[in-house]
Amino acid sequence: MGFSDATDIACTPDGRYALVTSSGTDRIAVVDIEKLLSLIQRLPQYERQHVLPNHLGYPTEFVVKHIPTGKNPRAILIMPDNQRAFVTNTLDDTLGIIDLAKMEMTGTVDLGGPKAITKQRWGEQLFHNAFVTFHRQYSCNSCHPDGHVDGMTYDIESDGIGIQPVDNRTLRGILDTAPFKWEGTNPSLSRQCGARLAVFFTRLAPFTPEQLAAVDYYVTTIPRPPNRFRPLGATLTPAQRRGKEIFDRTTANDGRTIPLLNRCATCHFPPYYTDRKRHDVGTKMSFDRTGNFDVPHLNNIYDSAPYLHNGMAATLEEIWTVYNPDDRHGATNDMTKDQLNDLVEFLKTL
């Protein structure tokens, strides 16, 4: 069985054990530190670096026990007397008490959270649990921590060749931004997270209709955090105002009219800054099935790098300085460096 979403670790004062929480499988792994160090020392350097971190069999040599917990265990604290440890069971609002002599859960403390399991709460619990994946290897939260992104690209095609990477997209604020998937072929979250999920991700039976409805509902409630580049109610800085003018412009620096589809605001207009359509912006790679990709929303775009459908742009600047040679992703090649900097400053405020 997998050990998804390892979240926190604490070592006993005597240095004998390390306790690691798995928020995706509702367990704590008890690691015998001496056995782990012995394994590391006897392995050749190559295996230490390249095999041990990914070998699913090695943990049997140093994980001596798994302790069941409440839902979604995260933080863990070991008391200085080496007698007890406490773990936060985040999604059932309890504090678990562990007897370190027995390495067992001996009690819980109710933290007074809501007792009714609403549709949103149930969806949140399902989102954070790896029960739906083969061997419980990962949860929805594994790739979308806090409903956001892990900064990775994935090849999720079933051929297993690894030649069609796609950028992981945020789930924050995606209500009313359908369609989904970079190719824009899923018209709803139910389509995105339903049977398709079982085929390409979980390799098990899909969510039941009731579970799927709860997960979908929870995803639509994941909020965007406050924008750190533009506090609520704040006016734009001079650079941000200049960037907005670039974003909204209809003429290039030489006075020529910019074609409608080459204007930023044509495809990215408020409030979500997406027209919810597919466009070819010149980023198609040789193994891509299509060059038409879904227009992502731009809200809080500053913290969702990398960019473009396959994550090839490491920064916002690279979208236009490296991957827009023919002005197919907006008319930008006439811009000065200062203008591009201002545009990026404005984009960070969205």
Q: What residue spans do the PLM features occupy?
A:
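Periplasmic c-type cytochrome electron-transfer domains
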Residues: 1-350
